[in-house]
């Protein structure tokens, strides 16, 4: 049976680790041995009760200071590159590289002659030179590339060994959703889930709340309360009575069950969604969504 060695740097509650958790959970239930190399404190930690999973922790997180982020990134690449060689003499090993970031272990895998599979969640070609370089390296190192949308795959020069597999939702999440169109309409509650990155539209969402006092607005941020407070202070935001901002949540199903409409306000001039897991979650909950007109996210929505 195959032995899966999975590398994912930043373990939080965003889309890519959620999808990875679902994949690994199915593999673990089928009896596969999985070694997971990732940071602490996110959704992937919910897999630790499986006896056939071994977790190797690496220290990695983002910083508001780009120089510190680059230093942390470089350090974790060296660490994971060297760590990967512990499986040098293991047979039937597959290196699963989740997102573009773990380039160090991908390189180590190719040096050792292991089968390297990338699960590509980003769209590097609408980002900066750094991500474009990582995407170029991915196309050289990967035996297989899994994309999450046709839009995303269309930017790759390489076509061989590229598969499009749209993201899905775990059954235990879907089972907690309780769609009720009538009560949802009556609530007049607007929901958005995302990060504090400006291109994700948090300021625009807050402005909508200020202008539309007849609606209730909820913003669920994939970040700590401390960083939310800093963001509010930095941008001199006045939190109006009809707006509630929540920090990182382990379970977002209750928010969908109380919502009437879900927004994705990503600025397509600065950032194009490759998929949009929150939109899939919202539609599964029977909720209408408003999304950008470009990118993988637009493949899911019909006017």
Annotate the PLM regions.
Residues 5, 73, 84-102, 117:
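Short N-terminal targeting/anchoring amphipathic segment
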Residues 36-43, 169, 193, 217-231:
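Glycosyltransferase donor-sugar binding loop
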Residues 264, 279, 284, 288-291, ...:
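Short hydrophobic beta-strand element within catalytic cores of glycosyltransferases
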